Amino acid sequence: MRSEQQYIDLYTQARELICSHAPETMNAVRDEAFEDFRRQGFPSKQVERYKYTDIQKLFAPDYGVNLNRLEIPVDPYKTFRCDVPNLSTSLYFVVNDMVYRGEKGEVCGEKGVVRGERLPHSTPKLPEGVIVDSLANVFSHPSPLTSHLSKYYAKLAKTSDDAITALNTMLVQDGLFVYVPKNIKVDRAIQVINLLKATPSNAQRQVPDLMVNRRVLIVLEEGAELKMLFCDHTADDRHFLATQVIEAYVGENASLDLYCLEETHYKNVRVSNVYIDQQANSRVNHNVITLHNGITRNKLDLTFSGEGAECDCYGCVIADKQQHVDNNTLITHKVPHCTSNELYKYVLDEKATGAFAGKVLVEHGAQKTSSQMTNQNLTATKEARMYTQPMLEIYADDVKCAHGSTVGQLNDAALFYMRQRGISLSEAKLLLQNAFINEVIDKMQLEPLRDRLHYLVEKRFRGELNKCEGCKLCK
């Protein structure tokens, strides 16, 4: 049986159940997504954008899916902390695909809010008009604003173009919604902890390996400013498969800083698609940090729809054992006078594999485009493998574009120099690897997060970091 057939059968048999636990805005596009998924099937490695990751194999196992929206009786605020020292954030949790929010650790869902115990680290009040809530709550309460906002759902993430997006859209029942009104600046960063958990600690029965479908919709109106930090973690030693689709609309003169940090278990599979649309004179800073994982596949599609927009896209990957990390980016310059900059760095040890495929598309008429793409990689062993494919596709004649990639080992001369001065070989390698990765870390705008990442990266290279350093479950 083809790996996609089980998901086709699942939707056919459980469509009414899926729809009964989701708002109409999400249900309205579900059947179309199903038809697109059935038509496409999972992409093979012959498909250009998926050539480095075997998607069909990842989705072949029989995972359980929580379509009944059964709550796992766990208070994430009590069992899990992911604090960044000196970084003041508004803290939210997504446990599998259920959104926890508010001063009392409330659980958001289609039935409203389930209140929990008041917690000492309550989430501070957001600026007037700012919404951070579950999609189900927002779209289940009709108003002129929600009617306006519902038009953004599943518009960037086209199900006809990507089978993973189609699968997520047909199965997802809730998600996180973030809205910032015109000219509102959110000074305090929004921190979202994506926590995968299959069963409470006192469960007596065996729980199947779990598939989770997460969704995020971000809308920034003209002149709005927002910083968001996503931290992905696993709380159970089980196999998880997580699909994630993020849509972000960045209005004219708006600014979005987006950080995605992964510290998951080696049994975790994460497939994430991020779609960003930028209007005139907007700014986006997109950062992907993979410190610990099993198999990770990140896709970024960013489009310039208005002149004068800028984006900086940074990524750093540290992988060992048999971990696999695949980053695929497409930046489309549709209009003139836009600037894009990409820098991705990998350090691969043991039998880890990495892949970076980046493409910059400059369409007809997109004159005065400026674009720079760089991918640099270190392989610490002969068994480690890195695949790199930077690409430019240009249909305008007045542009400034460059791209390049390197794959190599640590500099022997530098190692020899440090050994001559009494530094051990292991410490010398650590210093060089840190210096290599720190070029990416130093470009991140949030200073407390930057300092924290320097600390976590060093611990990762020393082999002392297996899960989130702030997780109470790991103590």
Say what each PLM segment does.
Residues 108-117, 125-128, 139-141, 145-423, ...:
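Conserved beta-strand/loop scaffold segments within soluble protein domains that form the structured core
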Residues 1-166, 343, 349:
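N-terminal amphipathic, basic helical "cap/leader" segment at the start of enzyme domains
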